[in-house]
Swiss-Prot record:
Binds to the 23S rRNA. Residues 11-20 have a biased composition (Basic residues). Residues 23-35 have a biased composition (Gly residues). The keyword Transport does not apply. GO terms for molecular function: rRNA binding; structural constituent of ribosome. It comes from Picosynechococcus sp. (strain ATCC 27264 / PCC 7002 / PR-6) (Agmenellum quadruplicatum). It comes from the Bacteria. The keyword Phosphoprotein does not apply. Belongs to the universal ribosomal protein uL15 family. This is Large ribosomal subunit protein uL15. InterPro entries: Ribosomal_uL15 (IPR030878), Ribosomal_uL15/eL18 (IPR021131), Ribosomal_uL15/eL18_sf (IPR036227), Ribosomal_uL15_bac-type (IPR005749), Ribosomal_uL15_CS (IPR001196). One of its GO terms (biological process) is translation. GO terms for cellular component: cytosolic large ribosomal subunit.
Length: 146
């Protein structure tokens, strides 16, 4: 085998299509672009997603209703008023609330909201607090840990 004997495999090389070189060449006259219209003209065509001036789908979609959030943040929610039955200086976590029966299902990390009143000092450990809940827990002498 010598370099002078090497040749590409049969069928691996394809000739470039030469358009606009007469009718006999197969792609003469309009070069395969049809008669008229925007797609037959020279230069760039339309951008991706262009729908002829109509509001394109990618701009219509957010305006429509009933689209679900792809990755929603789900929390197990407890209001401050539900914590009044607990004894003073108790450490409140999602597990302790489930054991006490205040929360029945684990829907995700614990979030404490500020509805209701609290008169007992508690050590609350949760993933998130509303501003009102944090103020009420600390006003009752408790602490909040995220």
């Amino acid at each position: 085998m010598k370099l002078s004997n090497l040749s590409p495999k049969a069928g691996s090389k394809k000739r470039r299509r030469r358009v606009g070189r007469g009718i006999a060449a197969g792609q003469g006259a309009s070069c395969g672009f049809g008669m008229r219209g925007q797609k037959s003209r020279s230069g760039t065509g339309t951008k991706a997603g262009f729908e002829g001036g109509q509001m394109p789908l990618y701009r219509r979609v957010p305006k429509l209703k009933h689209f679900t959030i792809v990755n929603p943040k789900n929390f197990t929610i407890v209001n401050v008023g539900q914590l009044t039955d607990l004894p003073a200086n108790t450490e409140v976590t999602l597990e302790s609330l489930m054991a006490a029966g205040i929360v029945t299902t684990n829907d995700g990390p614990l979030k404490v909201l500020g509805d209701g009143e609290l008169s007992v000092a508690l050590k609350v450990t949760a993933a998130a607090f509303s501003n009102g809940a944090k103020a009420k827990i600390e006003a009752a002498g408790g602490s909040c840990e995220a």
